[in-house]
Amino acid sequence: MKLSVLSLASLASAAALNAKVLTGKSLTRRADFCDQWGQVTTGNFILYNNLWGQGNADSGSQCTGLDSSSGNDSIAWHTSWSWSGGAGQVKSYANAAYVFTPKQLSALGSIPTSWSWKYTGSDIIANVAYDLFTSSTADGDNEYEIMIWLAALGGAGPISSTGSPVASPTVAGHSWDLYSGMNGQMQVYSFVASSQTESFSADLQEFIMYLQSNQGLPTSQYLVDVQAGTEPFSGSDATLTTSAYSVSVA
């Protein structure tokens, strides 16, 4: 079953309300937050609950929490949810958003990352995915969305104008199906892993370079957001646990 994923960037970034700031080189678990736009800041990360699509559900809830952080670029966290109804509609995008100065793609050096995670629950339809956004200016509207799906659980699928991949490349040592489609005025590219990858290490710059060479992504664009999280459609007693996540932009 092919499902549509809506863009999350503007709603996620608009959620800067009542942020709780944590400091220190090493932090341990804090209480979960369950409000729609709940967030916590630690190091170079903002951890969002981001229940932007909860109105699409007949019932459900979701809570997110910080488990630990080390330095500025490494975090462990979890999110737990149950959602029913609203078939084919994303309910949220709990994610760890990396805070950095927007950088033009032509000047990007690397985006090294690693992510170890696991999912538990019943009847889960969801993804586990990076979400990158670019704009023609450092503070402009998002024009391109680049998703990197490490898992498509229960039949979840990306935005696609045709329902079929436009290519099946090998990038960063893994095989992917690449989908292309529009979300309003924004071009969306989604790399969907051929097999579920629960321990992932790569340079995300390789995905950007592939799109520049093969799909015409302009090098004049600015990278403005790097996020990693999960988009649930439906399921019960589900928990995504990120035991270790790191990223940086150089």
Swiss-Prot record:
- Tell me which positions the record assigns to the signal sequence: 1-19
Q: What GO terms fall under cellular component here? A: extracellular region
Per UniProt, which keywords does this protein have?
Answer: Carbohydrate metabolism, Cell wall biogenesis/degradation, Glycoprotein, Glycosidase, Hydrolase, Polysaccharide degradation, Secreted, Signal
Q: Which GO terms describe its biological process?
A: cell wall organization; polysaccharide catabolic process
Localisation per UniProt entry: Secreted
Q: What GO annotations for molecular function exist for this entry?
A: cellulase activity; xyloglucan-specific endo-beta-1,4-glucanase activity
User: What reaction is this protein's catalytic activity?
Assistant: xyloglucan + H2O = xyloglucan oligosaccharides
EC numbers for this chain: 3.2.1.151
**Glycosylation (residues):** N72
Q: What class of enzyme is it?
A: hydrolase
Source organism superkingdom = Eukaryota
> Tell me, what does this protein do in biology?
Catalyzes endohydrolysis of 1,4-beta-D-glucosidic linkages in xyloglucan with retention of the beta-configuration of the glycosyl residues. Specific for xyloglucan and does not hydrolyze other cell wall components.
Provide the family line: Belongs to the glycosyl hydrolase 12 (cellulase H) family.
Do you know which PANTHER family this protein is assigned to? BLR1656 PROTEIN, XYLOGLUCAN-SPECIFIC ENDO-BETA-1,4-GLUCANASE A
Which protein are we looking at? Answer: Probable xyloglucan-specific endo-beta-1,4-glucanase A
Origin species, per record, is Aspergillus terreus (strain NIH 2624 / FGSC A1156)
Question: Which gene does this sequence derive from?
Answer: xgeA
